[in-house]
Amino acid sequence: MSTGTFVVSQPLNYRGGARVEPVDASGTEKAFEPATGRVIATFACSGEKEVNLAVENAKAAFKLWSKKSGLERCQVLLEAARIIKERKDEIATVETINNGKSIFEARLDVDTCWQCLEYYAGLAASMAGEHIQLPGGSFGYTRREPLGVCVGIGAWNYPFQIACWKSAPALACGNAMIFKPSPFTPVSALLLAEIYTKAGAPPGLFNVVQGGAATGQFLCHHREVAKISFTGSVPTGVKIMEMSAKGVKPITLELGGKSPLIIFSDCNMENAVKGALMANFLTQGQVCCNGTRVFVQKEIADKFINEVVKQTQKIKLGDPLLEDTRMGPLINAPHLERVLGFVKLAKEQGATVLCGGEVYVPEDPKLKHGYYMTPCILTNCRDDMTCVKEEIFGPVMSILTFGTEAEVLERANDTTFGLAAGVFTRDIQRAHRVAAELQAGTCYINNYNVSPVELPFGGYKKSGFGRENGRVTIEYYSQLKTVCVEMGDVESAF
């Protein structure tokens, strides 16, 4: 498959173990190929009747799935992981076409997906409660039970990965899931749905409904939905909290960020530069946990800036399906204009553009309508600038300098976000001291933007709550029942 050739020819909803057209609609959406600007799909947004059918299907599957042993669920998840691994190139290609990230990155994303399913397959087979001895031979025990029908609402920057990260722990715990992808990237979640069915999941266990805000509202308000997990923007997260509160539904929110990356003067310079690039330019900078506020100690600022600019200018832009491309297009035209607007405003507020920040037109004529821009480095930034305070969600790195550890910690924590943070230093005591003081859910020491499925991921402050990945996520997709057993006579107060 090559750029400019892919067209969706099948329905994009998945219900009852098959692709289906929605029975009713709340509007239509178009999905684009960011590299070319070409429409690859026009689809109906699921209406209330379609959402109701998806929930009914999921409820029926839940009754079967929740009665299976942990080992039986483990076997299905392991088979799904095997199929994902087997179809890695196909999935990565579809992801690249619909999202715009390089095929190199997309393959790495798919690796984290089968790893996630394998990890939770192992936990499915080992979930257990506790036995508590009580006086007189009586005892109590706990049961970890599934919630029911869970809803996952995904973002467009990691469409397939987010679908896996939300569904794997949900299914491991015995739940069913209805997944709503972003309307910008509706395609790859269908591949996961088909894989689960092929792996032996009951029809309806993982359903996909397409749509925008209205479809999301139908899901959040549905009385049979037990839990919602959302990845996306803070304003949308707030609305989901409000809707979920009316039904007293537990939620997981993974929202935005404006994360600090602190570079101390004693760092390994080569690694720090690599870390800064990883913290800013993966997926064209469209990553919620990116370390876009790069604080560099004054003693090494000039050297660091020179090197990071040199390496940034080497990044290969172009057709995301080519093996040597390392940066593809942004997700769509409005988002490209938004990111370019941040760069323009930064210059107006006094920042200096050392490289990039401009529209890029690849030589290949089929890419001339793609949504490309050159990766941007900003210096002479201040903490009060818009580019330092607001999430840009594009390939824009803002560099600030600092003097002391105490100073940089105060400035790094001066944000309403708290998704991630990073520190580069050779001083191991300082590294752990700084990580302890940073107000963020995930802190990196001498690395950035690595996502082992064994480690929990999630935010502080307005970056959300709850966690993806790691053993703890089991607690967010299950509920604890206490059983108290009396082995003697009842001692009554009456």
UniProtKB/Swiss-Prot annotation:
Annotated GO MF terms: 4-trimethylammoniobutyraldehyde dehydrogenase activity; acetaldehyde dehydrogenase (NAD+) activity; aldehyde dehydrogenase (NAD+) activity; aminobutyraldehyde dehydrogenase (NAD+) activity; formaldehyde dehydrogenase (NAD+) activity; oxidoreductase activity, acting on the aldehyde or oxo group of donors, NAD or NADP as acceptor
Modified residues (N-acetylserine): 2
GO biological process, one term: carnitine biosynthetic process
Keyword tags: Acetylation, Cytoplasm, NAD, Oxidoreductase
Pathway(s): Amine and polyamine biosynthesis; carnitine biosynthesis
Chief subcellular location: cytoplasm
Record: active site: 254, 288
Residues bearing PTM N6-acetyllysine: 30, 298, 303, 344
Keyword Acetylation: yes
Superkingdom in the source lineage: Eukaryota
Catalytic activity reported: 4-(trimethylamino)butanal + NAD(+) + H2O = 4-(trimethylamino)butanoate + NADH + 2 H(+); an aldehyde + NAD(+) + H2O = a carboxylate + NADH + 2 H(+); 4-aminobutanal + NAD(+) + H2O = 4-aminobutanoate + NADH + 2 H(+); formaldehyde + NAD(+) + H2O = formate + NADH + 2 H(+)
Chain residues that bind NAD(+): 180, 232-236, 391
One GO CC annotation: cytosol
Family statement: Belongs to the aldehyde dehydrogenase family.
Quaternary structure (record): Homotetramer.
Designated name of the protein: 4-trimethylaminobutyraldehyde dehydrogenase
